[in-house]
């Protein structure tokens, strides 16, 4: 499944991890899961990223969201590297599993291959890909960063909150949205349905087109 993208079902891979063997669909279960790859163990940007993800792990856990890291190094390398990650920012614990994928099969199927980066032997490396997978095993959101650019974990959390809010209330979230702020009502929802669904009411932006498509409401 080299073209894995939004709306696709992730393959039910059998994976070797720092927590033992898992099947991906079983791991997802009824939860949302953040699947994220890093190019290599014992590298600078990856160390800061994994440390930061460990720092945010409690926030994801509060939301019932699981974390699953991916790299091409083996399990023993991952376990040794975790010691460095935890020492870099004392008090942060890497409690989530990290997949070992030395044959590159998992990252190929999850569309995480970097076309430009290679290891010293010329082997393929993953880019900084991140997929948020829903309970239906479908990709709900993807980020794709090059090896030179670390991801923003605060934005990953914000985007996760937006997805969860949209799924729970059947709404959409506007630009720069944060939890607690107003959401927008999708165009396919009539005013009559909106009145029934949103007891707090809604506000329609007055625009030069006189089209009533930008409607804001508040949800819990």
Curated annotation (Swiss-Prot):
Signal peptide: none annotated. CDD domains: PRX_1cys. Its EC number is 1.11.1.24. It comes from the Eukaryota. It catalyses: a hydroperoxide + [thioredoxin]-dithiol = an alcohol + [thioredoxin]-disulfide + H2O. Belongs to the peroxiredoxin family. Prx6 subfamily. The active site is a conserved redox-active cysteine residue, the peroxidatic cysteine (C(P)), which makes the nucleophilic attack on the peroxide substrate. The peroxide oxidizes the C(P)-SH to cysteine sulfenic acid (C(P)-SOH), which then reacts with another cysteine residue, the resolving cysteine (C(R)), to form a disulfide bridge. The disulfide is subsequently reduced by an appropriate electron donor to complete the catalytic cycle. In this 1-Cys peroxiredoxin, no C(R) is present and C(P) instead forms a disulfide with a cysteine from another protein or with a small thiol molecule. This is 1-Cys peroxiredoxin B.
């Amino acid at each position: 499944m080299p073209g894995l993208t939004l709306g696709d079902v992730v393959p039910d891979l059998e994976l070797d991890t720092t927590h033992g063997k898992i099947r991906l669909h079983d791991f997802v279960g009824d939860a949302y899961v953040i699947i994220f790859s890093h190019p290599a163990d014992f590298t600078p940007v990856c160390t800061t990223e994994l440390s930061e993800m460990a720092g945010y792990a409690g926030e994801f856990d509060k939301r019932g969201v699981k974390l699953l890291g991916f790299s091409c190094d083996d399990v023993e390398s991952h376990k040794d590297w975790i010691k460095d990650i935890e020492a870099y920012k004392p008090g942060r614990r890497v409690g989530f599993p990290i997949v070992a994928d030395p044959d590159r099969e998992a990252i190929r199927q999850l569309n995480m291959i970097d076309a430009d980066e290679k290891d010293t032997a010329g082997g393929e490396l993953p880019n900084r890909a991140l997929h948020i997978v829903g309970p239906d095993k479908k990709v709900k959101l993807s980020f794709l960063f090059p090896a030179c650019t670390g991801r923003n974990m605060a934005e990953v959390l914000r985007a996760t909150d937006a997805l969860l809010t949209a799924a729970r209330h059947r709404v959409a979230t506007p630009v720069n949205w944060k939890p607690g702020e107003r959401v927008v009502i999708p165009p396919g929802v009539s005013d009559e349905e909106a009145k029934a669904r949103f007891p707090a009411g809604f506000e329609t932006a007055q625009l030069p087109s006189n089209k009533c498509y930008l409607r804001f409401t508040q949800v819990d």
